[in-house]
């Protein structure tokens, strides 16, 4: 049916919004398009907030309309450039607007800004859900005539698979071009950087031209692209004006809403019309995955008034009394996309939680009254919005189907019916009226039997049942799952295969018998509609299927007949998991790893490397649930572990086989407590709290010594050896206790210390200096593993503690570093037990590895950071914990501490640089590949002897945090030009070199032998070399070095260290490179 034109101007909406705002001006909604409204706000509501999120330090970051519109123009310029157009010229659209697909997992702010930027550039954006199969992506590309696709890295594999299919499809149009999706920092730049930017030339779009293409859920064979014109988008934007509450300035939490979803764009339109503020996760790449816990906590931290989410999250929150109490304090919780269980809703409203039941569709728009003013105890029922003209049409079973009629307030984007001579859209949704409240309606079901899950996803059972019904053992089948997390199927066997399904053995046999057909069905189904073997229910001979005269199953009657069995199978699945994977015979590390590997591979039907993020390999929420349930079943069956205390999100918190195995093994062996399932930032804070209480009092009883006595841990390492040599040479230092763990070998500590000094080009005889007392002990023990006499001697004499001993292992979890954290606390207690007037200063060598999750918008300052920034690997997390414990100790006690964030250390006076690190491995691989990588950018590597001198300088400073990197960074190009000269190897662009390394990895196969790795050790770090590199066009370029390490402010460090402040301190250069290469040749790492 042809479309219906929308008349201009739109009728003036009721004056319900923008009553009391000092920053928001209601825009003219009658004739402007949404992009024009954006520009209008940049001039008339410039300081009104559009987005907000929680900063790293816990503060709220607000993005105003003026700032966002500038970012939109940047996105538009970028888009025009990507399509080969001048950024300041209006594209020629006589042949129609190009359709630009967006296949990306981005934070909501970046995504919505990008969508609007594509519109400003003169093109039609088409957000494509990354949950689609590659076949569905091909279908959408063809149907929407997509000419260009913006792709984000995690979706590249999906797009490549789609392109392979496109190449083999002779009916497909030409292959779309592609570009890389921007990150937040590409679009939102500092005010200084933004000065002088001009707005893009923008041609007012026609009212009836396409503003955006949205696709349906893909519940049928393939999702359908649905175009919204600019006129339609403006109609939808006015929905809040037909509501009952003023939303201007209200903060709506959108953390659970992917912006490629219909509601993502609708919320942006509502914000433009009403001044609603959209709260989301802090922009970062990769984007934060929504979980039950982080959506709830982030929504509250951002002071949200309303939380918009999916029913499955609401159900989970309802089980937590503390959550429910908090939800009751909000304006309300809005849910949509699927049904909420009646018992759940009843529990919440009885606790005074206001529920807003949002109903609508991509085709017809939002149809329920949004954000009603009154608390509705009958939360399942809602009124139809005044914006919509509807009719309730009885069907053959006397149920009422909602039909949406075209009007100038609400014109459906799709028409499939005519009602009383008016074009209309028949929704297929069946409604029941409220028995006593006229005008209130409840959804009963669907005429097309579409199943709405609690996740908001939908399953259309017809095509899937048709596939299964072709199996010779199946007479008929019915899919079920309304209001549930996942789908199941009820199968009626043919007469010769009937059996009593209470016979577990026969049930298992029949499931195996029809499983190939189920797998065929699953291959056709979208991810959320796939059926697991345990979700196959078989009919009982005592309750046969009933059929209509047309020999079709009486769906509703049969589903109702099997209601108890359906409830029971969901209960069983919640309590169990895949029963066909045996539990390990023991829960040690090796056997647990094998078990987890088998579970992940069985559920995902593909092999995933132990260290890989299985969500990046396509694991969806349904598969995550099966992995979780299978693990919990095995733990319950074979251990005494208290699984009730494990977080629902533990799969997301440990998203690789290796990390998940480590977690599960610790739970099974009773090494984990109730906090083990919390998100990693919470784990870090919990560990800080555990070791930041009950500090001993400091009781001074002796005068301060005239000279310093230092307790130095880790003196046999590269940095420790250099520190030791400098302390020995210092006239202000009377004694050094060089503290190290006992060696597994029988080599005496004196010999180990001499060897360590010699290896770094230092005088080995220093180990026997009269200033040095070599101590073997264990800081993880309360008495440091030494005699009472020696401990007392150290306690009464030391003036400083330099804690430099910490294992470097990026594969260990935070829990694995708890002994080291405990050791730091023991050293804090030792300091506080000192009889001196001031406790010995504790200097702790932290790491720049803490800054894994920082938004590189400026150099990192010498101030405390939040746990979220340091969430990465256990090593970086443990360093943050250590730094924060010291800060807490300084707050609660007289302790003075200095946390030194040590950067990348390079070789010292003799060039000694550990061969296992990334740079030596890179250069060794370059020799093998006969090419060195070159690129723009700086490196702030600092020679280990210079870093040691700075740390000794810091002993006399009162600053609590120091950033320790080279104060005079060198360029990557200068360093690698020196390598090229010394090694006689040509330079090639970094990306070209990376391609050579990748090719060598393919040639080496999945399991390269030891000889290959010895000659080409960069194979082990290929992924890191790819992900760490920061291109000069990347937004992070200004505030990161070439390999992605942040740039650092060094105000405190330069003030405290004469070594660093010395203008004569040389940059790294060719002389350093020669020393490194000579050392690597000397130890046999490089060929002579």
Swiss-Prot record:
Renumbered residue ranges of the record's region Disordered: 1-22
Enzyme Commission identifier(s): 1.2.1.-
Carrier domain mapped to chain residues: 586-668
Enzyme class, broadest EC rank: oxidoreductase
UniProt keyword annotation of ATP-binding present: yes
GO terms, biological process: biosynthetic process
O-(pantetheine 4'-phosphoryl)serine modified-residue sites: 621
GO MF terms, alphabetically ordered: ATP binding; oxidoreductase activity; phosphopantetheine binding
Region (Adenylation (A) domain): 38-451
Region (Reductase (R) domain): 712-951
Coiled-coil ranges from the UniProt annotation: none
Signal peptide region: none
SMART domains referenced in this protein's UniProt entry, alphabetically: PKS_PP (SM00823)
Pfam families in the cross-refs: AMP-binding (PF00501), AMP-binding_C_3 (PF23562), NAD_binding_4 (PF07993)
Keywords for the protein's UniProt record, in alphabetical order: ATP-binding, NADP, Nucleotide-binding, Oxidoreductase, Phosphopantetheine, Phosphoprotein
Domain of life: Eukaryota
Positions with a binding annotation for AMP: 261, 357-358, 362, 443-446
Residues the record lists as binding NADP(+): 716-719, 804-806, 875, 879
Function noted in UniProt: Adenylate-forming reductase, a natural product biosynthesis enzyme that resembles non-ribosomal peptide synthetases, yet serves to modify one substrate, rather than to condense two or more building blocks. The A-domain preferentially accepts phenylpyruvic acid and benzoic acid as substrate. The natural product of the enzyme is not yet known.
Note on domains (UniProt): Contains three distinct domains: an adenylation (A) domain that activates the substrate amino acid which is subsequently covalently linked as a thioester (aminoacyl-S-PCP) to the 4'-phosphopantetheine prosthetic group of the second domain, the peptidyl carrier protein (PCP) domain, as well as a reductase (R) domain of the short-chain dehydrogenase/reductase (SDR) type.
Family affiliation: Belongs to the adenylate-forming reductase family.
PANTHER family: ENZYME, PUTATIVE (JCVI)-RELATED, PHENYLACETATE-COENZYME A LIGASE
Protein name according to UniProt: Adenylate-forming reductase Nps10
Organism expressing this protein natively: Heterobasidion annosum (Root rot fungus)
